[in-house]
Amino acid sequence: MKKKLILGLVMMMALFSLAACGGGGDVVKTDSGDVTQDELYDAMKDKYGSEFVQQLTFEKILGDKYKVSDEDVDKKFNEYKSQYGDQFSAVLAQSGLTEKSFKSQLKYNLLVQKATEANTDTSDKTLKKYYETWQPDITVSHILVADENKAKEVEQKLKDGAKFADLAKEYSTDTATKDNGGQLAPFGPGKMDPAFEKAAYALKNKGDISAPVKTQYGYHIIQMDKPATKTTFEKDKKAVKASYLESQLTTENMQKTLKKEYKDANVKVEDKDLKDAFKDFDGSSSSDSDSSK
């Protein structure tokens, strides 16, 4: 949940709340003069208007072509909630967000994702090329501790026959996983800290346990729960396609998709103050317009 995103959501809500209220009222009164709703709205529109009108417009365009269900949004929401654990509610509250407003942003992100996926080549030829270097997801559990001495202590207890899940609950500082035996969600290449990923993929059999691994978070001891099993292209095709599509969700590809969708939607900006809002999508600018007059 990036700080810029959170700030943007807050500003968007404030901007359009002011628009809905209409002009005329004062938001601040001083002996030196008052700040009116109109002044505040105009200032916020000037600073944030282009960014927000882009999103609102693309919500209309993409929402007309692609389906994002409440279940899709809830799933992504719960992923964030799990990621931030006990701090999630505090992050929302400190940012002036509600679950509803955050879910609204998530829905937009998912619309962009679906549009990008729909505009991505997933022919067998493309997927077979990707399959040559593709690795399946794996599932591991881990015990995270702060220092090497504690990691070695846990490692010795495992060698002495202690159960991994019991030690995760007792020692792990990862509050999101410790009560579940330390088990993480399935992941593939490029999703974890490089040192963690290398050590995890080096475990070939279920039940294999790594030596302590140092990352920016501390020291991990990793247990393989479900190793990677690559079979044949036809059998793995569904997973390969999902992995390939995810790999294509780059900023560049999403921008290309939005440009295409914008062009197909016949967009006309009626507000002269926002005439440059879509210059990155149609190649126009106010200077171009002025020079053509």
Swiss-Prot record:
GO biological process, one term: protein folding
GO cellular component, one term: plasma membrane
Entry-linked Gene3D superfamilies: 3.10.50.40, Porin chaperone SurA, peptide-binding domain (1.10.4030.10)
PROSITE patterns per the UniProt record, alphabetical: PPIC_PPIASE_2 (PS50198), PROKAR_LIPOPROTEIN (PS51257)
Broad class of the protein's primary localization: membrane
Keyword terms, alphabetized: Cell membrane, Isomerase, Lipoprotein, Membrane, Palmitate, Rotamase, Signal
Protein topology in the membrane: Lipid-anchor
Lipidation (S-diacylglycerol cysteine): C21
Annotated signal sequence range: 1-20
Protein name listed in UniProt: Foldase protein PrsA 2
Organism: Listeria monocytogenes serotype 4b (strain F2365)
